[in-house]
Amino acid sequence: MSDERRLPSSAVGWLACGGLSLLANAWGILSVGAKQKKWKPLEFLLCTLAATHMLNVAVPIATYAVVQLRRQRPDYEWNEGLCKVFVSTFYTLTLATCFSVTSISYHRMWMVRWPVNYRLSNAKKQAVHTVMGIWMVSFILSALPAVGWHDTSERFYTHGCRFIVAEIGLGFGVCFLLLVGGSVAMGMVCTAIALFQTLATQVGHRADRRTFTVPTIVVEDAQGKRRSSIDGSEPARTSLQITGLVATIVVIYDCLMGFPVLVVSFSSLRADASAPWMALCVLWCSVTQALLLPLFLWTCDRYRADLKAVWEKCVALMANDEDSDNETSLEGSISPDMVLERSLDYSYGGDFVALDRMAKYELSALEGGLPQLYPLRPLQEDRMQYLQGAGRHRCGFPGGQPCFSPAGCSQVPPTRRFSHDDADVWAAVPLPTFLPRWSSGEDLAALAHLMLPAGSDRRRGSLLAFAEDAPPFRPRRRSAESLLSLQPSSLDGGPRHAQDSPPGSPRRRPGPGARSASVSLLPDAFALTAFEREPQALRRVPAPAQPFPAARDSAEPAEVPTPPGGRTQRSQGRRAARTHVGPLQSSLSASWGEPGGLHAAGCGSISSFLSSPSESSGYVTLHSDSLGSAS
C-alpha cells in the first residue's frame, strides 16, 4: 500500500524531469545539426535516439504521471482505451531506444574496424533503413497487447493499468525479454570491439606514422557546389572522443535501462505477479537516461555548439526556401552551357577521332560521307591553307620554292593525315565523292611538274596540260580516257628523286627497298564505267617496257628534274627490287585524256603504276605502289 502511495508523489518529479529532458534533447539535436555540414550515419542515429527519448517522456511517461495525479480524486479511474495507448507507446519507445543504442554501437564498430568498407557501402542509407526497421518491429510487437495478445483471464486494463509484462501475458513477456536481452548483448560486444580497435589504432599512430588513412573525396559541380563526398579518416583525438561517447551511451543505457528492465521483467514472469516498485523502477530509469544523453553530447567537442550556431541553424531550418532546394538538387544549379563544355568522342569506320574540350564542331559534315570533324569557325581558313599552303610546303609548287616548314603538316586535318589508306572507306564511298575533298588541281599540277619533262612531243591531253588548263578543283573523269599511264624512262636515264614527297601513312604496308613518291589520291582500282565504248584504249600495246625509275630514301635531299640522258647512275638495290615487276610493264597503257594515246615520255616518273589484265573482263586495272596510295 505504501508503494502505491508513492506513485502519485513521484508523478510531479516525472513531469518536471520530463520537461527538462524535452528541452535538453531538443538542444542536443540542434547542436549536432549545427556542428555538422551534412548528416552522417552516426549523427543521424544519435539524433534519432534523442528524439525517441523526447517522445518517451512526452507521451507515455507524461500520460502516466497525469493519470496518477488525477487518481487522487475518488471518482477518477483508468479507462480501457487510455491504458492500451499507454502500454503500446511505452513499450514501442522502450524497444526503439534499445535498438537505437545497439545500432549506434554497431555503426561505430563498423566505422573503426572496416573504415573503407563503411564509407563505400552507403552507410547513411543503411542507417535510415535501420531506423525504419526498428520502429516497425517495435510498433508491431507493442501493439499486439492492445489488439488482444494478452492474458484473457484477468486483463491488464481491468483494475487500473498494470503495464508490467507479467500482467500483460507470458508470450509478450518472453518476446520482450529475448529482444531486449539480445540487443543489450550485441551492443556490448560491438562497443568492446570499437573501443579495442580505437585504442589499438591510437597506439599504432604513435608507433608508426605511416598508418593507412582514408582520404576525403568531395565531388563538386562546375559552380563549386558540393554534390557528394566521402569522408576521410577522423583525427586521432576526434576518433577517441566519439568512441568514448558511444561506449558511455551504451554503458549508461545498459545500467539504467537494459539491465533494470530485464531484471523487472524476469522477476515478474517468475512470480507471475507485479509489484509497485517495478513500475517505479522502470519509469525512473527511463526519465534518467533521457536526461543523461544531452549531457554526454555536451561533453564531446564534436557536437558542442554555442547559442549563436544553434540560432543560425534554427533560422536556416525555418527559412527552407527554394534556394536551398536548388542547392541539393542534381540539376537545379547546373548551367545549360555546361552541356557543350564536355569532351566529345566520335568514331567513323573504325577510326577514333577525339575532339577538343572547348571547341564547337560542325557535325553536319558527316552527312557528306567523310568524318570531317573540323572546328566550326576556322573551317574554311584551314581548308584553304592546306590546299594552297601545305601543298607548296610539301610538293613544291611552280613558282614557289619547296620548304619544309612544320606549318604545312600542322594544318592538315586529322582525317587527311591518318586515313589515306583505309580500304573500307574506298570501298564504301564512290571515287568522285573523294576527289573534291582529298585532292586538288594544284596537287596534280605540282606532281606533274616533278614527273613529266618539258618536251615538244607532249600532247595536250597529258597531265601537265591538264594542270595548266584545268581549274583547281576539276573532278577526275570516269571514262577510259582519264586513265593515267606514265611511260618509264630508258635504262640510261637518271632516276628522279623527290625530297618533298608527303610523309608515309602510319598504317601503310611495307614495300621492298626505298619508297617512291606518291599520288595520294589514286586508289587501287579505277572505276571502269565507260570501258564498254572504248575498250581499245586499255588494250593498246605500248612501247617496250623498261624498269621504272626509283626514288631514293625520303631522307635524302631532292634533286632538280633533269632531261633525258642527264644522269646515268642507278641504285643497285632499286634495280633488284624492280626486277619482279618486269613482266607486267609490257601491258601499260599510254592514253590520257584524249583518244589516240600518249606518246612515250622522255623521262621517268617517280610514281609506278602496275597494270594486270582482269581474268573476267580482259580489262586492265592499274595499281599504285606509291607512298600515299589508298592500298
Curated annotation (Swiss-Prot):
Q: Which GO terms describe its molecular function?
A: G protein-coupled receptor activity
According to its record, how does it sit in the membrane? Multi-pass membrane protein
Q: Which Pfam families match?
A: 7tm_1 (PF00001)
Q: Which residue spans belong to the Cytoplasmic compartment?
A: 33-41, 106-126, 184-243, 298-631
Q: Which Gene3D superfamilies match?
A: Rhodopsin 7-helix transmembrane proteins (1.20.1070.10)
- List, alphabetically, the PROSITE patterns matched: G_PROTEIN_RECEP_F1_2
What are the entry keywords?
Answer: Cell membrane, G-protein coupled receptor, Membrane, Receptor, Transducer, Transmembrane, Transmembrane helix
Instruction: Name where it mostly resides.
Output: membrane
- Where does it sit, as one GO cellular component term? plasma membrane
Source species, domain of life: Eukaryota
Where is the stretch described as Disordered? 486-518, 546-590, 603-631
Signal peptide region: none
The subcellular location is: Cell membrane
Q: Where does this protein have compositionally biased stretches of type Low complexity?
A: 605-617
**Which sequence ranges are listed under topological domain Extracellular?**
1-11, 63-84, 148-162, 265-276
Which InterPro entries does this entry report, sorted A to Z?
GCR_153/162 (IPR022347), GPCR_Rhodpsn (IPR000276), GPCR_Rhodpsn_7TM (IPR017452), GPR153 (IPR022335)
Family membership: Belongs to the G-protein coupled receptor 1 family.
Its biological purpose: Orphan receptor.
The protein's name in its UniProt record: Probable G-protein coupled receptor 153
Q: Which organism is it from?
A: Mus musculus
Q: Which gene encodes it?
A: Gpr153
